[in-house]
Amino acid sequence: MIRTRTNFLRPAVTLLVAACAAITARPTPAERGHSPLIVVSPTEPREQTADQQVQQVLNRLGFGPRPGDVAKVRALGVDQWIALQLAPDRIEDGAAERVVASYETIAKPTAELIAMYDRGQLAIRQRQKARAQSGDTSSKMDLRAEVLQGDPALREQLRQNQRILGDVQSAKLARAVVSERQLDEVMVDFWENHFNVFAGKGLDRIFIPAFDRDVIRPNALGNFRTLLGAVAKSPAMLFYLDQWQSAADSTQPTLAVARGARAGARRAAPTAGMTMEELDRLAPNAQLTPTQRKRLEAMTSEQRMQVVQQRAQAGARAKRGLNENYARELMELHTLGVDGGYTQRDIIEVARALTGWTMNPRGTAEFVFRPEMHDVAQKVVLGHVIAGGGGVEDGEAVLDIVARHPATAHFIAHKLAVRFVSDTPPAALVERAAQTFLKTDGDIRAVVRTIVTSAEFFSRSAYRAKVKSPFELVASAFRAIDAQPDTTMRSAQMVGFLGAPIFGHQAPNGWPETGESWMNSGAILNRINFGVGVAAGRFPGATLSHWSEMEHLKAATREQQVDAVILAFFGGQSSPDTREILLNGENPLAAKLSASVPADSASADLGVMGTGADNAPTRGRVLAPAKNGAPRPAVGRALGQPVQLNGLAQVVGLAIGAPEFQRR
């Protein structure tokens, strides 16, 4: 090797010791309002070596090391680094903030995004209507193609519509690549998969930016009940699982009718009415526009009562009925788990309690409680009685019950242990994490701390025990070469090409957390080809010229280059087979897998897969799910024409496709 490991790291260590001293000299949490810095020292020996522990935390609590990160963790200490990551508000993250600020749409209010989306859709509908009146029966796709070719203003408008989803996908990956708050980004990815919403369902592509920005990110390391409530009231989830349309069964009285009847009974029949104060108490979140409020204020109390009763009757006529979708997924996927001890009767009772939890799909698209849709009768959920006559508080009571249930503690603890430790985490660790959940009333930060400071986390069996998801693979590859964040959609599209489009899982269970789901022949081949694409500079911002070792290794021998790449990309450890592949420049597995890929699937269009470009024609295909239900990636060349790499670029490309890099 050109440099020994000590020489390789010494300059960075010298600088970072001073930086770490500055970190420890920061004002106290009380002075700055930051989260406490809790350093947990090991209470028993750790099986992993010191070097392995550094790699473990960088690859599990983050998306892999950037150049210099290994030295930083060594200088700071593994336990101190963990403590700092668990207090992300103490970490300066200006680079990530600047990247996020460069996107056009992710900071825009949902109402503005809806208006933006509607303008383009309205123009298309108007042209369709004009065509229909003239007898033209061309399809919407033909019309869209004509508009895009002939109307620059509308073309730009439709591009903005596509960008709404593309921006939030790209920004999520860019943050994972550049952010210093790595654990926070890992937890955002975890919860957005746990509380999965599908961008391909209608207006959800417009609701997802706020879901990411206002619901998940502020609560990723916070309180589980708070996070659960924010998700339950988010337009993205309300729309995705049809909760916004769920209303009391026609056989059940609604809250508006019941309260209206009680208000009327207090007056003589000819003078029964409703004051504005009573209306506000009846529906405190009604989101009345100024015009609507003025109109109601101008009415007599009797007229106002009549409007409320008419609205309640209209709600009953809407025939929306009780929808169990969200209630079922709330219990099965979000809290208790499939074995959580609930019954179909519990699902129905939860759905009844949540009737009236809806939103205005247009305008502000904010959560609103509609009393005319709410089932007013008594409910019994998991043995807990929710008295009749309640309103929005019925749903809050349900969230309280399930968030604090022991089955939820175990389910969340197990899922976090799978994410951080192994696909089959030790039962004792899961139990300790579940107890932390219960003792802290769902403190996510405390549960994660229990897991990532445990002996099981630092066991030999946990080291490189996890297979990277497509998102983790792309982010870690870009971090390894010190790539600049890609603010186009191309890199985010690559995540979809590898099998897991960002916000692209249609079913509510989210992408799999276990490695077997990502390791079939097509997936492995695509991962190998992705490594070649990265080394060839096929992604904006991701070129080897950014890698700090590139310049001085150009003139090194092949063996020296291989040793340096193994140190930088694998933490210094590789199998003899991998080392031989890096030395000779040939991957026999790639050739074998290429021969097994069907010829008719040898082309795929990266430009439209798993992105906001849902209206573009799709070339190639995505394989049907495997027999076990696991996703299969698209197969083919999504990286342009094949390229033959040489020298150091070849070593790097092969390293990214190697098993050691595919695991974390």
Place the predicted regions along the sequence by residue.
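Active-site substrate-binding loop specific to GH73 endo-beta-N-acetylglucosaminidase modules
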Residues: V147-L158, Q162, V168-K172, D204-N219, ...
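N-terminal accessory alpha/beta regions
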Residues: P67-F190, H194, A199-A210, V215-N219, ...
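Bacterial N-terminal signal peptides
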Residues: R10-A22
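Surface-exposed interaction patches
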Residues: V186, F211-D212, A236-M237, A568, ...
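Flexible, low-complexity segments enriched for small/polar residues
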Residues: E31-P42, R46-A50, Q55-D69, A96, ...
